């Protein structure tokens, strides 16, 4: 089977079907969160939320993009403009590899607690 990067298949998912993971090592200070909000307000979502799909629960669990997800939850204007939908790129990996993916995605951003 030929490998195809997940970014070539971005889907729109209702924010209510997206959940944070339990192992996010990335912390963002309030000033940076405000900058992220300002960026999303001005430019829209330019990067998808990276998730894996939990078929049993019918939800998407965040690998990367937790703070972009938080912006949608915390700012009504963004939620309404985007109609409650977030762009999602899905990867399928076992739990131990998902944790490694989260760390790789976050390595260049924020402070890490690992």
Segments from the language model and where they lie:
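Short, conserved phosphate/pyrophosphate- and ester-handling motifs at nucleotide-, phospho-/glycolipid
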Residues: 65
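Short beta-strand micro-motifs enriched in acidic
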Residues: 52-54
